[in-house]
């Protein structure tokens, strides 16, 4: 008995181990504060204030320009302390006063007066949206309750699908569509710089689920010879701006028909759907394109879990993104999972090019 007690004592954590475990646990619990602090920074347009102030601003400068209530100056300081320690902004001491400056991350939040050429503030709103966050608190019910298992966590939390919310709530729909435009512009800017060869030699392309046509506009500008078409739901394409003369918008249902083109582009679309639906979409894509030797292919821009940067942040982001997508019963796939649906849809080969950090370009051939 004494020996067993001694062995159990030896297995107990040391004081330092206990403290470190507690810190790590609490750090996880407080992770949502990073998102809410970022959300506040976007609402207050702190990045724009710093930019307009010559690239550096004191706390008083920020307070004067964000409409801060006089009683909240110390609270703003505390918010900025979190935003600097997490790398959104930088801070330096200048003559005893904190001076806040932009980082590479906060430059992505610039969106005023055309300064934010790589603006992602609306996309950040999409990803950190309280509607999505609240949905994740329904995952336990979604996992364990018979009725809930036939719904998405978003439906469990809000009583409608994510897509119904976007269609019926003008403000939410506007933010979502603006976020998709921002993400497409940044992604296409990188792709056209690093992998523009994927569009060489083609004469027509259809962007399925292409929203307001940001990706198609980038391609049409870089390759004026490519006739671009955007297919999306009628109410989405009806609101699309006339961004380029060489783009045609078609309202339709991607599960019923995809117009013919040399190449079908699917950007961040298939991760919204389970395998059976992906196979249906891809089979229609295969019907829409010519044979491989005639230039036919499908270009997919998605996460391939486990492929890409070896740095911890992109690898962790892939897994976080995967669980995030659960809120609409979506999924981020590993290579073997992609291969399975490609083969089931009747494709013969594919090529993965990881040029987007956590995301990759997948070229799929008939």
UniProtKB/Swiss-Prot annotation:
Pathway the protein contributes to: Aromatic compound metabolism; melatonin biosynthesis; melatonin from serotonin: step 1/2
> SUPFAM superfamilies, from UniProt?
S-adenosyl-L-methionine-dependent methyltransferases, Winged helix' DNA-binding domain
Q: What is this protein called?
A: Acetylserotonin O-methyltransferase 2
Q: Which residues bind S-adenosyl-L-homocysteine?
A: 209, 232, 253, 267
> What's a GO biological-process term for it?
biosynthetic process
What species was this sequence derived from? Answer: Oryza sativa subsp. japonica (Rice)
Q: How does it assemble?
A: Homodimer.
InterPro entries reported in the protein's UniProt record: COMT-like, O_MeTrfase_dom, Plant_O-MeTrfase_dimerisation, SAM-dependent_MTases_sf, WH-like_DNA-bd_sf, WH_DNA-bd_sf
> What is the gene name?
ASMT2
